[in-house]
């Protein structure tokens, strides 16, 4: 989403994590996505770092100017989700990959974080206003994955009404529709595919 919002066109290579291509592992041995190879040969392989890079590249990427306390809240929330929420999300959604893991307890830990966040959401399309901001593109993908694990349970939960509305706005947004495009898995002899496709 950050690449789209910053109008940064890249060569896209869709990969299967079950069969990681060697060129990907050569530039980022940890073998996770996303991976962004820059023109100068440097590599960014963390989502939040790619977002930060896009913001530095296009300083007017987001329309709203946040207050200092809002900026601090955003950074604290992103860190919370990138570390604590993701830890519990992985053990809830992929419990069979871990030993002696109680999926429900990790689900409830995620829920506790969402319940706290729910109290801070404005009654607008996005978190702070009707304009998308850094917190939206950084946090909503985690919440989307959390819902996917058990949509019926998530949708029926009465503790996070603002989170549910916020996520639904995201799921129905033009932004998500523009970036959630299915690409075939990259093969070495494939022609170059550019992303975003409509800039």
Where are the model-predicted features located?
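GST superfamily/GST-like fold recognition
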Residues: 127-152, 156-159, 164, 170
């Amino acid at each position: 989403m950050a690449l789209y919002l910053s109008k940064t066109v890249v060569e896209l290579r869709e990969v299967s994590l079950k069969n990681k291509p060697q060129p990907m592992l050569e530039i980022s041995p940890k073998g996770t996505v996303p991976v962004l190879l820059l023109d100068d040969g440097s590599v960014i392989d963390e989502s939040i770092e790619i977002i930060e890079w896009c913001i530095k590249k296009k300083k007017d990427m987001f329309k709203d100017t946040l207050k200092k306390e809002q900026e601090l809240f955003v950074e604290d929330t992103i860190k919370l989700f990138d570390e604590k929420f993701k830890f519990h999300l992985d053990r809830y959604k992929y419990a069979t990959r871990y030993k002696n893991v109680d999926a429900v307890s990790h689900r409830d830990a995620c829920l506790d974080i969402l319940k706290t966040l729910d109290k801070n959401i404005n009654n607008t399309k996005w978190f702070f206003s009707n304009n998308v901001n850094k917190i939206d593109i950084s946090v909503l993908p985690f919440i989307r994955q959390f819902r996917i694990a058990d949509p019926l349970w998530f949708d029926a939960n009465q503790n996070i009404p603002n989170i549910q509305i916020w996520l639904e706005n995201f799921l129905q947004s033009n932004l998500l529709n523009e970036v959630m495009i299915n690409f075939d898995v990259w093969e070495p002899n494939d022609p170059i595919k550019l992303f975003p496709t409509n800039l």
